Amino acid sequence: MPTIQQLIRHGRSMKASKTASPALEKCPQKRGVCTRVYTTTPKKPNSALRKVARVRLSNKIEVTAYIPGEGHNLQEHSIVLIRGGRVKDLPGVRYHIVRGSLDTSGVADRKQSRSKYGAKVPKAGAAPAKKK
């Protein structure tokens, strides 16, 4: 415990907060180039083939980013936009690829939560989504 005199001389130091997505360098999104697109398996107890991409960002940092939604058109050398946000059951995946921007297409036939997946408004002639 410091004395009052020591506190007058030095004061309390603030604990530095650690960011969850350091590669973004305080930016909301960053652009990058896919160096590898592959699938990986999640931690126990989940089971799936999760689509991920290794991305070299414009600041030369290489990160692993998750590709959300069903189906994608990404391959090596695709230009993508990444945002923060981890995937809980994939260790080391701390970023998401933004669907519907740059080379990434939106999710086809998406009816709900469209803005999160870069899907356009469905045509008026198409059958409406059935409610339960």
UniProtKB/Swiss-Prot annotation:
Protein keywords: Methylation, Ribonucleoprotein, Ribosomal protein, RNA-binding, rRNA-binding, tRNA-binding
InterPro entries on file: NA-bd_OB-fold (IPR012340), Ribosomal_uS12 (IPR006032), Ribosomal_uS12_bac (IPR005679)
GO molecular function, one term: rRNA binding
Gene3D superfamilies in alphabetical order: Nucleic acid-binding proteins
Single GO biological process annotation from the record: translation
Superkingdom per UniProt: Bacteria
Secretion signal span: none
Residue numbers spanned by region Disordered: 102-132
Residues with 3-methylthioaspartic acid modification: 89
Low complexity bias locations: 118-132
Gene Ontology cellular-component terms listed: small ribosomal subunit
NCBIfam families in alphabetical order: rpsL_bact
Subunit-structure text: Part of the 30S ribosomal subunit. Contacts proteins S8 and S17. May interact with IF1 in the 30S initiation complex.
Reported function: With S4 and S5 plays an important role in translational accuracy. Interacts with and stabilizes bases of the 16S rRNA that are involved in tRNA selection in the A site and with the mRNA backbone. Located at the interface of the 30S and 50S subunits, it traverses the body of the 30S subunit contacting proteins on the other side and probably holding the rRNA structure together. The combined cluster of proteins S8, S12 and S17 appears to hold together the shoulder and platform of the 30S subunit.
Family, as annotated: Belongs to the universal ribosomal protein uS12 family.
Name under which the protein is recorded: Small ribosomal subunit protein uS12
Lineage of the species this protein comes from: Bacteria, Pseudomonadati, Chlorobiota, Chlorobiia, Chlorobiales
